Amino acid sequence: MATKVFPSFSKGLAQDPTTRRIWFGIATAHDFESHDGMTEELVYQKIFASHFGQLSIIFLWTSGNLFHVAWQGNFEQWVQDPLHVRPIAHAIWDPHFGQPAVEAFTRGGATGPVNIATSGVYQWWYTIGLRANQDLYNGSLFLSILSALFLLAGWLHLQKNFRPSLSWFKDAESRLNHHLSGLFGISSLAWTGHLVHVAIPASRGQRVGWDNFLTTLPHPQGLAPLWTGNWAAYAQNPDSASHIFSTSQGSGQAILTFLGGFHPQTQSLWLSDMAHHHLAIAVIFVLAGHMYRTSFGIGHRLSDILDSHVAPSGNMGGGHRGLFETINNSLHFQLGLALASVGTICSLVAQHMYSLPPYAYLANDFTTQAALYTHHQYIASFIICGAFAHGAIFFIRDYDPEQNKGNVLARMLDHKEAIISHLSWVSLFLGFHTLGLYVHNDVMQAFGTPEKQILIEPVFAQWIQASHGKALYGFDVLLSSSGSVAFSASQTLWLPGWLDAINNNSNSLFLNIGPGDFLVHHAIALGLHTTTLILVKGALDARGSKLMPDKKDFGYSFPCDGPGRGGTCDISAYDAFYLSIFWSLNTVGWVTFYWHWKHLTLWQGNVAQFDESSTYIMGWLRDYLWLNSSQLINGYNPFGMNSLSVWAWVFLFGHLIYATGFMFLISWRGYWQELIETLVWSHEKTPIANLVQWVDKPVALSIVQARLVGLVHFSVGYIFTYAAFLIASTSGKFG
């Protein structure tokens, strides 16, 4: 029996006598469309089955979180005193630890070295009604079983008799019905049920478990108000402002409210407001999922909806005609839309998690807030770049000019020059003006005349904040004007709670902004527009440009079209994606620097530092980066080590990975080929070393692959470096 040679999905690659076999095999492992013997139906079936595997991994991971906190954490102690006990993620078992290390990492009331949790899981589990380790073990066991079931389901759907057909996958209306009504709608309804039946009673000191949840009414009147139409009863008698969370002291009976603002003690949104929100979402999505025609011949066909989207003026060509077939037959288009949506949502999660904290006491755990914000912004930036990458692949592999004649897609391609040049102009304008202001202010600081800085108040943004009810700026408008219709309309509902929150300086809702915010806002706008320019140009030029009209014939990633055809290097759609990641990381750096520094000064009661130092570049370098890195360069000192030592090491390690990236990025392929050949020669001539023979002849990475390897090192190093800086500088100050 012949041994199977990697990659099994490509006979051609498997016969390659060089190390290219390994690298190209890894690079194309997930490009199902390019595999030998692949059919359209099989691609859909493989992706469908892999979704179950993905969910299985997610459930296993969350199960592990629950299990390790229950086993090695201090959840029950934390629940007794959330503000003073540090939450433990898990124990550290490390044979290299000497006594100083053991002492440094033994904290949070533990008996040995532990890691502190900065993910917010303690706050989340506490808010949703978990109180004991047994609750965590139960959740862990349930998710482990679910994980095994999903793994089995994935395997099952790969078996011949259980593979869905292509027509099943392309039944868009039924899928929308399932996803909107089933997944979004019913799960939101179920979550409302959990909040009402378990979380809200727990917040009022009442334990509801598997043994008593069928006999414990979440509201004294039960379902009577629902059947009689007296829904307002569920909002009457809410928790009072003096309510002590997790006790009956000051608690009410309301389960679905619209109080607005935050619970005064926990500084998080009211649980009854969140239950109301999820119920509303459930109703909307259950209805939305039933708008489309499935088995019963009622409702809309998506193709009819899209085909009727043609502007009556005739000025917008074919509108959405032909889009249904195009999208429904292109997995890359669908993935692009999904990634764009999820990326945007992920960024919104980052923004709302700190400004409107949903979990009890999250607002008091500064390191966790910083970690969650940074994590979600980084994830969002990568996902959104991926949306454009798959958009470009769609244009190369799936776009049919005949099918889309004159519609919105064709029109985007027809006037791409106007789109790209406008984006280019905006990026240049933002870049030169913002940098010009920063540099002018730097020079004025350097020459000792800070009063000559150009400082611009963000009046439009302040006006928007004022219209939402912020009184500080003195704009008498909308919600900040007691005489406005908007003010009086909501006065009896959510407005008092909201106004109290927005004008309270102890939270992060609509922070006070000034000239430093104005400048960094425009720096971030520059980053966003430049990233967008690179991505949009990459997608719109993916099929061809004036320089290379036949680009689509070369695929998504190609280095050049050989010698003798100038200008064809570095213009593939992949090159645009590759460049966009650098700009994306640059932008997310500015975003997180801004958020973190502004919050550090807010938490320390030292907002003047940000206001004064953020108007010039030297202020950012000196008073944010240098000043806050002291914890990182002090991890090891003559007095031994401390609990920040690991972050000091990660900080250095991150720089090392980042720097390694440049070895792949700033080097010509021929140089590496010559170097490898020299190394191979020296091995073959050296006794003992020449006992090891290569099966594959070593060759250098292709230009495209070296770019990928360099980009990955650059990104990973960048992330490690900033993560270490963020966590060490925040936890070093606030514990």
UniProtKB/Swiss-Prot annotation:
Binding-site residues for [4Fe-4S] cluster, renumbered to this chain: 560, 569
Reactions accelerated catalytically: reduced [plastocyanin] + hnu + oxidized [2Fe-2S]-[ferredoxin] = oxidized [plastocyanin] + reduced [2Fe-2S]-[ferredoxin]
Annotated residues for binding of phylloquinone: 672
Gene Ontology MF terms: 4 iron, 4 sulfur cluster binding; chlorophyll binding; electron transfer activity; magnesium ion binding; oxidoreductase activity
Keyword Ribonucleoprotein set for record: no
Alphabetic keyword roster: 4Fe-4S, Chlorophyll, Chloroplast, Chromophore, Electron transport, Iron, Iron-sulfur, Magnesium, Membrane, Metal-binding, Oxidoreductase, Photosynthesis, Photosystem I, Plastid, Thylakoid, Transmembrane, Transmembrane helix, Transport
Annotated GO biological process: photosynthesis
Pfam families membership: PsaA_PsaB
Annotated compartments: Plastid, Chloroplast thylakoid membrane
Broad enzyme group: oxidoreductase
Residues that hold chlorophyll a B1 according to the record: 655
UniProt entry tagged with the keyword Ubl conjugation: no
EC number: 1.97.1.12
TM helices/strands, residue ranges: 47-70, 136-159, 176-200, 274-292, 331-354, 370-396, 418-440, 518-536, 576-597, 644-666, 708-728
PROSITE patterns with a match to the protein in the record: PHOTOSYSTEM_I_PSAAB (PS00419)
Record InterPro entries: PSI_PsaA/B (IPR001280), PSI_PsaA/B_CS (IPR020586), PSI_PsaA/B_sf (IPR036408), PSI_PsaB (IPR006244)
Residues bound to chlorophyll a B3: 663, 671
Family stated for the protein in its record: Belongs to the PsaA/PsaB family.
Main function: PsaA and PsaB bind P700, the primary electron donor of photosystem I (PSI), as well as the electron acceptors A0, A1 and FX. PSI is a plastocyanin/cytochrome c6-ferredoxin oxidoreductase, converting photonic excitation into a charge separation, which transfers an electron from the donor P700 chlorophyll pair to the spectroscopically characterized acceptors A0, A1, FX, FA and FB in turn. Oxidized P700 is reduced on the lumenal side of the thylakoid membrane by plastocyanin or cytochrome c6.
NCBIfam families linked: psaB
Subunit structure: The PsaA/B heterodimer binds the P700 chlorophyll special pair and subsequent electron acceptors. PSI consists of a core antenna complex that captures photons, and an electron transfer chain that converts photonic excitation into a charge separation. The eukaryotic PSI reaction center is composed of at least 11 subunits.
Protein's name according to its UniProt entry: Photosystem I P700 chlorophyll a apoprotein A2
